[in-house]
């Protein structure tokens, strides 16, 4: 079982990416949202958390931007009637923080809007999600997939501000990294944010 795969992003398809590590190319299935975020890192080193699904005729790797997202995926596919593709669809539509909010508000309609999930399945899913999802949130505050080279407080504050605006952690890291390159590591968060937003 793999914990994560770290290597060079060499190919992006409609539903998967290829990461080359020590001469081996790993095809990893991703959500559309994560695929979009990774496009800015073509031919760069990335780290993707993975979940393996092994069947008689295939071995599929599903990739995630954080350990928390992967554990959420594992929670989702533990429910009867929800397979890996449906689990990935849920995470594509609802980032972890939003999914926690949906569970807290018992918004069955939102979950039922995911292709492949009916109202009854959504109602059953909501009960367990409300109880178990909050335990995953501490994992959400971990390093981004592509660790930033800048560790100053303005950079970290900027990432937090962008995530509050709805950007993923990976996208926020990329935007702030580009803003720092354009200005400097000593720039304040007030100076960096306007430039970072232009990089979205």
Curated annotation (Swiss-Prot):
Species of the source: Chlamydia trachomatis serovar D (strain ATCC VR-885 / DSM 19411 / UW-3/Cx)
Subunit structure, as described in the record: Homotetramer. Forms an RuvA(8)-RuvB(12)-Holliday junction (HJ) complex. HJ DNA is sandwiched between 2 RuvA tetramers; dsDNA enters through RuvA and exits via RuvB. An RuvB hexamer assembles on each DNA strand where it exits the tetramer. Each RuvB hexamer is contacted by two RuvA subunits (via domain III) on 2 adjacent RuvB subunits; this complex drives branch migration. In the full resolvosome a probable DNA-RuvA(4)-RuvB(12)-RuvC(2) complex forms which resolves the HJ.
GO biological process, one term: SOS response
Membrane-spanning parts: none
HAMAP family reported for this sequence: DNA_HJ_migration_RuvA (MF_00031)
Chief subcellular location: cytoplasm
Segments of this protein annotated with the region Domain I: 1-65
Family statement drawn from the similarity comment of this UniProt entry: Belongs to the RuvA family.
Chain segments carrying region Domain III: 150-200
Region (Domain II): 66-144
Record InterPro entries: DNA_helicase_Holl-junc_RuvA_I (IPR013849), Hlx-hairpin-Hlx_DNA-bd_motif (IPR003583), NA-bd_OB-fold (IPR012340), RuvA (IPR000085), RuvA_2-like (IPR010994), RuvA_C (IPR011114)
Pfam families the record matches: HHH_5, RuvA_N
Annotated segments matching region Flexible linker: 145-149
Domain of life: Bacteria
NCBIfam families for the chain: ruvA
Function: The RuvA-RuvB-RuvC complex processes Holliday junction (HJ) DNA during genetic recombination and DNA repair, while the RuvA-RuvB complex plays an important role in the rescue of blocked DNA replication forks via replication fork reversal (RFR). RuvA specifically binds to HJ cruciform DNA, conferring on it an open structure. The RuvB hexamer acts as an ATP-dependent pump, pulling dsDNA into and through the RuvAB complex. HJ branch migration allows RuvC to scan DNA until it finds its consensus sequence, where it cleaves and resolves the cruciform DNA.
Name of the molecule in the record: Holliday junction branch migration complex subunit RuvA
Protein location: Cytoplasm
Any single GO CC term annotated in Swiss-Prot or TrEMBL for this entry: cytoplasm
Domain remarks in the Swiss-Prot or TrEMBL record: Has three domains with a flexible linker between the domains II and III and assumes an 'L' shape. Domain III is highly mobile and contacts RuvB.
UniProt keyword annotations, A-Z: Cytoplasm, DNA damage, DNA recombination, DNA repair, DNA-binding
Gene Ontology MF annotations: ATP binding; four-way junction DNA binding; four-way junction helicase activity
């Amino acid at each position: 079982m793999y914990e994560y795969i770290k290597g060079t992003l060499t190919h992006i398809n409609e539903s998967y990416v290829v990461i080359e590590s020590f001469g081996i190319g790993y095809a990893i299935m991703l959500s559309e949202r994560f695929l979009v975020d990774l496009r800015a890192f073509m031919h760069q080193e990335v780290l993707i958390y993975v979940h393996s699904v092994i069947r008689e005729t295939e071995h599929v790797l599903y990739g995630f931007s954080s350990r928390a997202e992967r554990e959420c995926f594992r929670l989702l596919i533990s429910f009867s009637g929800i397979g890996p593709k449906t689990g990935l669809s849920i995470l594509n539509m609802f980032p972890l923080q939003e999914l926690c909010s949906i569970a807290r508000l018992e918004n069955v309609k939102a979950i039922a809007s995911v292709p492949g999930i009916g109202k009854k399945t959504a109602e059953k899913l909501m009960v367990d999600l409300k109880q178990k999802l909050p335990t995953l949130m501490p994992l959400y505050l971990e390093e981004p997939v592509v660790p930033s080279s800048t560790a100053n407080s303005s950079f970290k504050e900027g990432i937090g501000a962008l995530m509050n605006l709805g950007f993923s952690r990976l996208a926020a890291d990329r935007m702030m990294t580009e803003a720092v390159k354009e200005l400097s590591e000593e720039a304040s968060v007030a100076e960096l944010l306007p430039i970072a937003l232009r990089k979205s």
